[in-house]
């Protein structure tokens, strides 16, 4: 679980990186579909599933909007992300294992874009936070 120190670190990092959240989302999703091509199946309804496409950019923006929501609900992710969990479980039917894959891609992109801010301490706190987000999103699968 997230300590007060972790929550403060996530909030501090988010205040810096949120201005670039659209680019982070685009880069993370683009990376995910290249490194983990099996994830493309969730986007087969798009005319093209290629890095940097308009659909990837739009969905990356949505994903990062979800991360922003999670930051604002950091004290109770399970309740705060209930509707997103329902949507992913029952409407989108995303395998919850893919949340971990996308989390990894988000971490890589943030580390690349913000090397100074992505300290080892920020890394561990953000990783714990994203793991908490994945767990909260998987809640409705049970």
UniProtKB/Swiss-Prot annotation:
The modification N-acetylserine is found at residue 1. Residues 1-142 form the Globin domain. This is Hemoglobin subunit alpha. Heterotetramer of two alpha chains and two beta chains. Involved in oxygen transport from gills to the various peripheral tissues. GO terms for molecular function: haptoglobin binding; heme binding; iron ion binding; organic acid binding; oxygen binding; oxygen carrier activity; peroxidase activity. The gene is hba. Gene3D superfamilies: Globins. InterPro entries: Globin, Globin-like_sf, Globin/Proto, Hemoglobin_a-typ, Hemoglobin_oxygen_transport, Hemoglobin_pi. Red blood cells. Belongs to the globin family. Heme b binds at residue 88. The keyword RNA-binding does not apply. Pfam families: Globin. GO terms for cellular component: blood microparticle; haptoglobin-hemoglobin complex; hemoglobin complex. Keywords: Acetylation, Heme, Iron, Metal-binding, Oxygen transport, Transport. O2 binds at residue 59. One of its GO terms (biological process) is hydrogen peroxide catabolic process.
